[in-house]
């Protein structure tokens, strides 16, 4: 797809570097003379002090791609302003997806939670540098719409099956079911139109069950874990953030990270900077040494000492599996993003050295379609909570848990926000054109996939 609505396709990497150099956006600027490190303003869109300038760079990307203003829709100023406010979250989602998908930028600092100056700091990847050669241009030019299953596409990193002997919970983890999530992603308007990412290369017969497609690990590292230089960065793989991870000590956020690998392991070690493994990707519990409450510090440290050799998460087929290897008990549940309503699954103990499925993506998408069709009263839950050392069913508020890990699959969050935006737009007939252009076809495809798998009621 070379053009969108008559607008020549723009390569995100080149476009962003030009915007950083332009000096037209407050807070978007280079941080060194070599122009290899820059900052992007990143205010949370739920804040009350949000204004138009906070979404300026995200809107600019939508305009550059011909996604805004909507073609064929002329609204008076008050309605146009309201429509723009509704679209801001989508602009930010698309910008974030494109930023992660190019493979050209490495997140160095996430200061988005700063109450005064929320921003993120990125560095140009040393493997690619600041220039763009023909190969890189071709990679950014390819659309995910060219990577449909008819080309023999494999599940790739999202659907890795490295350990073939692992027991699966149901026959749905066949090759057809394994392709469900990938196909849904490929039909996504967000990914197809905005990411500028690559198709997964076809595999030779017989490789489907064993191939694990490596991601550029350094591009997903956080400050708590030093970034090793990848030996062979696989820049042709879609670099979508698999999980947003938040670690809290008794309600206090101590780490926010993005896991972009199909396997990760939660570890604790005072010597965390010495960790150099990238398979599975490590997520290191921060030291509780700075906690002001000495009693809390003592018990938190005691629990963390028994996490080793770790808690492993792995994406296998359409399910997320957990394996607890340490002595510290871990309880899990799936609930609402803020944990304010009852969980959709009762809190359960993760048995030690036993693979346990804790989330099913195909179930989420089926429930999401039911929610969209108004056959379901509430939106499906996708936030996974892991309580270390304390039973989540004890009735205490989650912010009282000594060690709590919150996992949010990025793709679930993006799809739910898209459906919610669609629902808002559909209440006003004059703004129907503002809906995501391919939402209907997307959900028709999801319906077909679910019916083919025998999952449709």
From Swiss-Prot:
Induction: Induced by lipopolysaccharide (LPS). Induced by type I interferon (IFN) and viruses (HIV-1 and SeV viruses). Changing residue 427 to D: No effect on transcriptional activation in response to viral infection. GO terms for molecular function: cis-regulatory region sequence-specific DNA binding; DNA binding; DNA-binding transcription factor activity, RNA polymerase II-specific; RNA polymerase II cis-regulatory region sequence-specific DNA binding. One of its GO terms (cellular component) is chromatin. Changing residue 425 to A: Strongly decreased transcriptional activation in response to viral infection. There is a cross-link at residue 329 (Glycyl lysine isopeptide (Lys-Gly) (interchain with G-Cter in ubiquitin)). Acetylation inhibits its DNA-binding ability and activity. In response to a viral infection, phosphorylated by TBK1 and IKBKE1. Phosphorylation, and subsequent activation is inhibited by vaccinia virus protein E3. In TLR7- and TLR9-mediated signaling pathway, phosphorylated by IRAK1. Keywords: Acetylation, Activator, Cytoplasm, DNA-binding, Immunity, Innate immunity, Isopeptide bond, Nucleus, Phosphoprotein, Transcription, Transcription regulation, Ubl conjugation. There is a cross-link at residues 398, 400 (Glycyl lysine isopeptide (Lys-Gly) (interchain with G-Cter in SUMO)). Changing residue 427 to A: Strongly decreased transcriptional activation in response to viral infection. The modification Phosphoserine is found at residues 425-426, 429, 431, 437-438, 441. PANTHER family: INTERFERON REGULATORY FACTOR, INTERFERON REGULATORY FACTOR 7. Monomer. Homodimer; phosphorylation-induced. Heterodimer with IRF3. Interacts with TICAM1 and TICAM2. Interacts with MYD88 and TRAF6. Interacts with NMI; the interaction is direct and leads to the inhibition of IRF7-mediated type I IFN production. Interacts with GBP4; preventing interaction between TRAF6 and IRF7, resulting in impaired TRAF6-mediated IRF7 ubiquitination. Interacts with TARBP2; this interaction prevents IRF7 phosphorylation and activation. This is Interferon regulatory factor 7.
